[in-house]
Every structure is written in structure tokens, then in C-alpha cells.
Regions:
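PP2C/PPM-type serine/threonine phosphatase catalytic domain
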Residues: 1-362
């Protein structure tokens, strides 16, 4: 798992996760805690990195924040996206976006269950980052508690899917989650649902798009990993089938590899590999970013938005909307972003969460 450190705040053991807000369009004002990951500040699409010195926000100075979420089926007949927010004992906010494929079984399961697998070990890692400790026990090349949590969640999901009939048993899903504290933001993602931070005129991508497309460094790394596992890429898809290279579920690329390979061999297909190892994995990229007084908005969305709007355009849209009318709530902004994606003729479901980080500043 790749880890990049920028900073974090504190997480308490035994946090209350008993309630969940997940509705078609909802907003809330709740205390903020934030986590972010990366050894370097993420990509900046509008200015070069390291040009301005970041100012830290005082620890344990939590304030109420505004956030909102909205979704739409778009042109699709079925809604496969899911999203959620949880307030962890007033000390940490958890946001999750899940883009399902092959049905909604996987995304629905992750919305309800993924956080349960991020147990005390994962929270301990988050707590270390929040306190400013190094990740000496969880290095970039070592097993990370969040990676372990995702792995266990994927195993449980595959068992769950195995109890379902066609076609749900073949479903899969992306997952992008963000933990927000007063001083940091932690993101962990699998797939191509994206988290983006607006920071004083700049745009910071807080997640990697896991797609087998060679136009980016991350994409080339995914292609290499797939080939090394015995897989192959055809028409920018894993084995010519799946558009994302990391995902939860998708049994045929994991426990069902032998059957999948046999099916390809029976057709006389050329250029196929051995599928010695799973070419599709649920291993997350984890990033930790330090909060700054320059932070504006956090946007987390499925690719139904990102297919028609890039990261900088989304942040500019949010800023422009708030500049026109500062009384807008984040659920208004999330709804407007989804509507813009639909008007831009997205071909997918669209789900979006917007968090106003300005309201948590001193």
C-alpha cells in the first residue's frame, strides 16, 4: 500500500459509530476531525507545489462544519452508487463513496460495513498521525492497518456475494473514504472514485484513479502490476473486461481466476496471461494531508462526475457558486454538481459529497 504523509489529528478508541446518515440529499453541521495521507502534497493542477508555506490549524479546536451529499441515477436504469457519512463520537468525520458495477450489492455492503473493519489497529495508526508521530510501524512497503482492514472487508464481501444468486454475486465496487479531523485529512481509495481538495486557488488530488490506462504514472504502475500478476490489459480494461484495476468484489478476478482463464482459453483468445495472482485487488492508496488555513472545500465523487469534469473544474465550480451566494449550504452545492454532470451528458450514476473546510478554521 502506498502511503504519503502530510498530517492528522486525534481519534479516540471506542468511537461511537452507531448511527449513519445516508440519504438522497442531506446536510449536517457536526464537529470536524480530518485525516490525509501522502509523503508529498498531492498533485496541484493549477500551481506548482511548495510555493506557499502552510499554516497549521490549532489542535483540538474543533468547530461545526457544513457538508452535504447528493446522488442521481443519471441516464442509467439502475442506481449502483452508495455513499455515507458517520460522526465518530464527535471527534472524527467519516465520508465514504462507493461506485458499484454489475449491480448494487457490493456498494451497498461497503456503505454499511466497511467502517466496521477499520478496527482499533487502523484507528491506532490514524491516532499516531494525528499526534504527529511518524509511521515507523507502518512504512510504505510494510503492511498497513488500513490495507489490512480493506483486505478483510473484501474477503467478507466475497463471502457475502457468494450467498447471492446471479447477477449480484458477480458485482464489484470502488471505495474512497475520507477521515476528517481538525488538523488532518486521511484518504484511502480503491478504484476511480476521487477525492479532491481546494486550497486557496489550487487543486489537490487526494486519491489515485486506479485504471489500466497508460496516460499517467499511476496508470502505468497499474498496468505493470496487472501484467506481473499474470493478467493483461486489452482496450484499456483488465483482461478486456473491467475498467478499474482495483476494486472490492469481482470474484472472477480473484477466487474465480481459473474459471475465467479457462473461458478465455476455450475461445482461442490470444495474448492472454496465466492469472497466477489476482489482477484486481482491494489494496488502497492511503494519503495523509495536514490541514491548512488555506483549505476551502473537499469534494468526493464517483466517476459519473469526473468523466465530464476534471478536478480543477469541480473546485472552481464550488468556489464560484459560493462566491455568488455565500448562504448556499453544501447540500445545495452537491446537488448543483450532480446536476451539472447530468447536463454535461454523463453516461453513469453520479454521487457527490462536498465538505466546507472553511467553517472549521480558527
Amino acid at each position: 500500500m502506498n502511503i504519503a504523509l502530510m498530517s492528522l489529528n486525534t481519534i479516540e478508541d471506542g468511537a461511537d459509530v452507531s448511527w449513519l446518515l445516508s440519504t438522497f440529499c442531506v446536510c449536517a453541521a457536526v464537529p470536524l476531525l480530518q485525516y490525509i495521507q501522502t509523503s508529498k502534497e498531492g498533485k496541484d493542477s493549477s500551481t506548482k507545489e511548495g510555493k506557499s508555506k502552510l499554516k497549521k490549524i490549532g489542535r483540538n479546536k474543533l468547530a461545526a462544519i457544513d457538508w452535504g451529499g447528493h446522488d442521481s441515477e443519471g441516464p442509467r436504469d439502475e442506481m449502483e452508487d452508495s455513499w455515507c457519512m458517520r460522526n465518530l463520537n464527535g471527534k472524527l468525520l467519516y465520508f465514504g463513496i462507493f461506485d458499484g458495477h454489475g449491480g448494487a450489492a457490493s456498494s451497498t455492503y461497503l456503505k454499511s460495513n466497511l467502517l466496521d473493519f477499520i478496527d482499533q489497529a487502523g484507528m491506532k495508526m490514524c491516532d499516531q498521525v494525528v499526534k504527529g508521530d511518524t509511521l515507523k510501524d507502518y512504512g510504505v512497503d510494510e503492511e498497513n492497518p488500513l490495507a489490512s482492514a480493506f483486505e478483510r472487508a473484501d474477503s467478507a464481501l466475497l463471502d457475502h456475494l457468494g450467498s447471492l444468486g446471479d447477477p449480484e454475486c458477480w458485482s464489484g465496487s470502488t471505495a474512497t473514504v475520507c477521515f476528517v479531523s481538525d488538523n488532518h485529512v486521511i484518504t484511502a481509495n480503491v478504484g476511480d472514485s476521487r477525492a479532491v481538495l481546494g486550497r486557496k486557488g489550487r487543486t489537490v488530488d487526494m486519491s489515485n484513479d486506479h485504471r489500466p490506462v497508460g496516460s499517467s504514472k499511476a496508470g502505468r504502475a497499474e498496468i505493470s502490476r496487472i501484467i506481473e500478476s499474470g493478467g493483461w490489459v486489452s482496450q484499456m480494461r483488465v483482461c478486456g473486461i473491467l475498467a478499474v484495476s482495483r476494486a472490492f468484489g469481482d470474484y472472477e478476478f480473484k477466487g474465480g481466476r481459473a474459471e475465467l482463464l479457462q473461458e478465455f482459453e476455450s475461445t482461442g483468445a490470444s495474448g492472454i496471461g496465466t492469472l497466477e495472482r489476482p489482477p484486481v485487488v482491494a489494496l488502497p492508496d492511503v494519503r495523509v494531508y495536514e490541514r491548512s488555513e488555506e483549505d476551502d472545500f473537499l469534494v468526493i465523487a464517483t466517476d459519473g462526475l469526473w468523466d465530464v469534469m476534471n478536478s480543477a473544474q469541480a473546485i472552481t465550480f464550488v468556489r464560484s457558486m459560493m462566491k455568488r451566494d455565500s448562504t448556499y449550504k453544501m447540500h445545495d452545492v452537491a446537488s448543483a454538481l450532480v446536476e451539472r454532470a447530468i447536463k454535461s451528458r454523463t453516461q453513469d450514476n453520479v454521487s457527490c459529497i462536498v465538505v466546507d473546510l472553511r467553517s472549521s478554521q480558527l
